[in-house]
């Protein structure tokens, strides 16, 4: 697969939130191919697995959001190769974002695990910040990872659906629906609390990764190896 992404030029949606339109090509059929991998993964989730791990719990709901780890769970060459393009494009946009906000570069050291997120109607997300944490089902303590996030990077793969637009709680702006192939970066804290409008049809798909100030403690709590955690360091 040839290079599918371009550097592009950042546009500002609001202070702190920037996006790059047409930053990566979405080949015909790739979303359907990746979605099939997600669906094949879902059917093997048991109730016991869901009770032990929040990721599996989300996976058993029909309409999602399904948070699928593409690094470990993509099995086909097509999906793996395209995901590598997503990673390269994301790192380029992170570098550009840090040029816009030089202090951000001083605060980021690690990346969380990637997520490939899909969901279908009538799903919507209520207002939340990306620093919001929930309790670990196994320990009863709040997961620490979300508290360490500095900004979140989303790659929107499709726009052939109604609804599903971003809305920010504290900014008087209309809902924003990024076009397919758009990368968006937003700060993680409460000032950028956001929701999505209800998804009315179709199946929304995006890649997401959080960029953090400290090592990936959430993965450590869920049993990740030191080698897996160390490789997420930003050098």
Give the location of each predicted region.
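Fe(II)/2-oxoglutarate oxygenase catalytic core
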Residues: 1-183, 191-235
């Amino acid at each position: 697969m040839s290079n599918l992404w371009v550097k592009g030029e950042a546009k500002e949606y609001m202070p702190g939130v920037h996006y790059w339109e047409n930053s990566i090509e979405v080949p015909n059929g790739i979303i359907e191919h990746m979605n099939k991998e997600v669906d094949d993964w879902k059917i093997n989730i048991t109730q016991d697995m869901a009770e032990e791990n929040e990721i599996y719990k989300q996976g058993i709901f029909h309409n999602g959001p399904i948070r699928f780890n593409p690094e470990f769970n993509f099995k086909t060459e097509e999906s793996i190769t395209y995901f590598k393009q997503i990673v390269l494009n994301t790192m380029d946009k992170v570098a550009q974002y840090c040029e816009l906000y030089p202090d951000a570069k001083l605060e980021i050291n690690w990346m969380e695990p990637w997520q490939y997120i899909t969901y279908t109607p009538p799903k919507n997300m209520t207002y939340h910040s990306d620093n919001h944490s929930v309790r670990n089902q196994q320990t009863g303590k709040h997961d620490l990872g979300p508290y360490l996030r500095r900004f979140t990077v989303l790659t929107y793969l499709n726009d052939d659906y109604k609804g599903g637009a971003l809305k920010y709680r504290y900014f008087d702006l209309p809902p924003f629906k990024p076009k397919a192939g758009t990368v968006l970066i937003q700060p993680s804290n409460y000032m950028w609390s956001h929701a999505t409008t209800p998804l009315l049809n179709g199946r929304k798909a995006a890649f997401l990764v959080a960029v953090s100030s400290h090592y990936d403690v959430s993965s450590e709590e869920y049993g990740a190896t030191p080698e897996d955690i160390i490789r997420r360091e930003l050098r």
